[in-house]
Amino acid sequence: MLRQIIGQAKKHPSLIPLFVFIGTGATGATLYLLRLALFNPDVCWDRNNPEPWNKLGPNDQYKFYSVNVDYSKLKKERPDF
C-alpha cells in the first residue's frame, strides 16, 4: 500500500499535498478518538466503577477547549456521594 502511494507520488507530484492532508487528517482523527476513549468521563472501561463521572470535582476540566472559564477557581456546589 505504501509502495503504491510512493509510486503514484513519483509519477504525479501534484498528488503529494493530497496525501499529506489525508494523512494528517487521519492521524488527527485517530488521536482525537484516543483522547475521547481515555480521558472522557462518559466512557467507562472499568466495570467495578460504573459511574466514573462522580469522581470528578467541579474544578476538573474535561472539555476539549474552554474559552473563559478558570476551573481552578470554581467553588464546590454539590454534595459528596
UniProtKB/Swiss-Prot annotation:
The modification N6-acetyllysine is found at residue 10. Keywords: Acetylation, Electron transport, Leigh syndrome, Membrane, Mitochondrion, Mitochondrion inner membrane, Phosphoprotein, Primary mitochondrial disease, Respiratory chain, Transmembrane, Transmembrane helix, Transport. One of its GO terms (biological process) is mitochondrial electron transport, cytochrome c to oxygen. The chain crosses the membrane at residues 15-37. Residues 38-81 are mitochondrial intermembrane. It holds the Pfam family B12D. The modification Phosphoserine is found at residue 66. GO terms for molecular function: NADH dehydrogenase (ubiquinone) activity; protein-containing complex binding. It comes from the Eukaryota. It is linked to Mitochondrial complex IV deficiency, nuclear type 21: An autosomal recessive mitochondrial disorder with onset in infancy. MC4DN21 is characterized by congenital lactic acidosis, encephalopathy, global developmental delay, delayed speech, motor dysfunction, dystonia, and spasticity. Ataxia, peripheral neuropathy, and seizures may also occur. Patient tissues show variably decreased levels and activity of mitochondrial respiratory complex IV. Component of the cytochrome c oxidase, the last enzyme in the mitochondrial electron transport chain which drives oxidative phosphorylation. The respiratory chain contains 3 multisubunit complexes succinate dehydrogenase (complex II, CII), ubiquinol-cytochrome c oxidoreductase (cytochrome b-c1 complex, complex III, CIII) and cytochrome c oxidase (complex IV, CIV), that cooperate to transfer electrons derived from NADH and succinate to molecular oxygen, creating an electrochemical gradient over the inner membrane that drives transmembrane transport and the ATP synthase. During complex IV purifications dissociates from complex IV upon treatment with standard detergent DDM (decyl beta-D-maltoside) in high concentrations. This is Cytochrome c oxidase subunit NDUFA4. It comes from Homo sapiens (Human). The gene is NDUFA4.
